[in-house]
Amino acid sequence: MEDVIARFENVLLIYHEPHAETLAIKDISIDFGRGNFTAIVGPSGCGKTTLLSILAGILPPSSGRVEVLGHTLYGDGSEDKRKCRSGAATGCDTGYMLQRDNLLDWRTIEDNVLLGLEIKHMLNDETRSYARELLRRYGLGDFMKLYPRQLSGGMRQKAALIRTLVFRPKLLLLDEPFSALDYQTKLLLADEVHSIIRREGCSAVLVTHDISEAISMCDRIIVLTSRPATVRCDVEIRLKEDSPLARRNDAGFKYYFNLVWEEMMKNEEFN
């Protein structure tokens, strides 16, 4: 892969406990292409969210090399390793969208979107104007003075995404952002979030348990094994449609679903 925005090279993670060690991730190597939307799927507890935490610079691996946006975050002799642990290497170029929206009930939607800018001392007339532009662009302009409790779950998650986008990130990490939503809202919001990410020109990595969601939203799916996690297979998705909703009706959708499902079924916990 020529244009790489992030890379794992032989990444290994061991959790050290008082009387035991647990091998969580074993020798994972993945290149994430710039401009691509990649999904990571696998059994519960296999290490999907752990990989996102490593990409975000939150969790150091036990060994191996990690590069994100041209910075060597982790690796022997890396000068950027210290920067990463202070959060400087990834900076605002990497955004993280969690399962929960984490909106503060006592702040308006606009003030919630501006919170990160305030914390990082980046709030000024220009960034405030850009935040309002994003709220209007993505259908929340009439709701920015309301409070989170007055919005639906889907609208709250969209506000959480905009809170991340105000930093103009180049890489978005999404940790099951639709899992708490009802099925209809989940489908509609996934379609809209996909469109927003494409329009904003971000690269993205999505962690999900939902194979259909992964196929409908992503260009590529990485299937992990049970713990200790390794890469079981790497599937490139080639469908004529780009919209997640339209992809679910694509003739090739079932082929990819069966392909990924069969790989998932090979995991030991299903045998």
Language model features with spans:
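Short coil-to-helix segment of the ABC ATPase nucleotide-binding domain corresponding to the Q-loop/switch region
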Residues: 107-114
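A short, proline-enriched helix->beta-strand linker immediately N-terminal to the Walker B motif
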Residues: 166-170
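Conserved ABC ATPase signature
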Residues: 147-151, 155
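Helix-to-loop junction immediately C-terminal to a conserved catalytic motif
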Residues: 56
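Conserved ABC ATPase "signature" region
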Residues: 114, 118, 125-143, 195
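The feature captures the beta-strand-to-loop junction immediately N-terminal to the Walker
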Residues: 41-43
